[in-house]
């Protein structure tokens, strides 16, 4: 949902400029939720300041949306833990939406995406997200999310690095508990604010797929990298059949976003594939 004012319509124009279908946008509310980034450097971490109270989506209701239009020709429906963190009504809206998607046999993809600063209306994430995950097919979650938020029973210590076998043990329980199809996890080793090592895991049908690792120095912007990874997975599922290839595609998109300022991954399918199939950093295109 976007506010029916100049700012809301400017957002629609921006979406249209990138060939995003905006026909199902609901218009209402008075303001667009925003956030500010106090960008860190070296050993100083970045800090996010949210300004999302009374935003259109935080006050939206089920009846604000034309659900037939929302789900028309959809193959996947994506939600994250950011929306239900805003208000009780936003949490109710998210739950209704995933139930509606399942009724229509549309696969639901859910990113736990825990943002502690947003959960201020009286509910904790572990009280809300499990019910949403019940209606999901694909979940973006790590072992900490599985145990601490989604209630997987395990004695494995997830406060430090774990083995592949321990990871599979936890994810087997998560998949069984919620009847999931696939669980996907990003890995990030932070050397400092400008230097990270990243990779990803995909677990499906008891098969663990591991991406190659990218050593990223001189990071331009970390904001939006997780969303870029999720977008890479979903677009990959629509384009490719092989899970290893899909994971490598998404991880390359994840990597590229670290080089682009702002919240948008302004890259192309061709650039992503070029990186994922290269063993070296890319040279200047001439």
Segments the model singles out, each with a brief description of its role:
Residues 118-205:
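Conserved phosphate/ATP/ADP-binding segment of small-molecule kinases
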Residues 101-107, 178-181:
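A short helix->loop->beta-strand "cap" motif at the edges of active sites that frequently abuts
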Residues 53, 82, 113-117, 144, ...:
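Active-site beta-loop-alpha junctions enriched in small/polar residues
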Residues 41-42, 203-207:
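Short acidic-glycine loop/turn motifs at beta-strand connectors
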Residues 1-81, 272-286:
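Conserved N-terminal subdomain of the carbohydrate kinase-like
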């Amino acid at each position: 949902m976007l506010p029916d004012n100049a700012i809301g319509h400017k957002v629609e124009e921006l979406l249209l400029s990138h060939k995003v279908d905006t026909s199902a946008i609901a218009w209402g509310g008075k303001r667009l939720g925003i956030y500010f980034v106090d960008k860190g450097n070296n050993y100083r971490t970045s800090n996010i300041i949210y300004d999302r109270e009374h935003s259109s989506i935080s006050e939206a209701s089920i009846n604000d949306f034309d659900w037939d239009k929302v789900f028309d020709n959809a193959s996947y429906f994506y939600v994250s833990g950011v929306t239900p963190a805003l208000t009780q009504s936003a949490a109710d809206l998210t739950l209704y939406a995933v139930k509606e998607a399942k009724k229509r046999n549309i696969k639901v993809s859910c990113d736990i995406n825990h943002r502690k600063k947003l959960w201020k209306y009286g509910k904790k994430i572990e009280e809300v997200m499990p019910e949403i995950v019940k209606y999901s097919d694909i979940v973006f979650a790590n072992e900490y999310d599985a145990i601490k938020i989604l209630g997987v029973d395990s004695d494995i210590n997830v406060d430090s690095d774990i083995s592949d076998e321990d990871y599979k043990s936890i994810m087997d329980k998560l998949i069984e508990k919620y009847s999931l199809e696939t669980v996907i996890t990003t890995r990030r080793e932070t050397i400092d604010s400008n230097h990270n090592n990243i990779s990803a895991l995909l677990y499906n049908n008891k098969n663990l797929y591991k991406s190659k690792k990218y050593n990223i120095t001189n990071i331009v912007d970390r904001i939006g990298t997780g969303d870029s990874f999720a977008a890479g997975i979903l677009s990959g599922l629509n384009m490719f059949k092989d899970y290893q290839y899909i994971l490598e595609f998404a991880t390359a998109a994840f990597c590229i976003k670290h080089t682009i300022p702002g919240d948008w991954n302004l890259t192309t399918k061709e650039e992503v594939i070029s990186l994922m199939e290269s063993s070296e950093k890319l040279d200047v295109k001439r």
